[in-house]
Amino acid sequence: MTYTLNIAKPALVLFKKLPKPIQQALIAKAQVLKTNPQAGEPLKGKYRLLRSLHLTIDGTAYRISYQVFQKQETIVVRLAASRENIYRKLDEMKLKP
């Protein structure tokens, strides 16, 4: 089964601010989710409905936070950012699980 991969508008705005090589690496890594939506680790606490896919680019750890909608066979990327900033940015976006 192949899932549809969507990027939430707030995530897209922040994504476009990243350097092109980082964008390309994040897009390539996110493609895994189409066939394996459970590839990322489940988050805990207030973001327990989100999952996080980890990758390292040029020595910097990045996270792709996403939500899986099984019935619709859809994945929505909520945010892609460096590990050090992702939870602060999720809080700023006021995402509700």
Predicted segments, located by residue:
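A short, surface-exposed loop/turn module that caps and links secondary-structure elements
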Residues: 31-58
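Conserved short hydrophobic interaction patches
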Residues: 29-32, 83
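Arg/Lys-rich, positively charged N-terminal/basic patches that mediate binding to nucleic acids
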Residues: 1-29
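Short, flexible helix/strand-to-coil boundary loops that buttress conserved ligand/catalytic motifs
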Residues: 19, 26, 37, 90-91
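A general secondary-structure junction signal
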Residues: 9, 47, 79-81
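Enriched for short, Lys/Arg-rich terminal
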Residues: 4, 13, 55-97
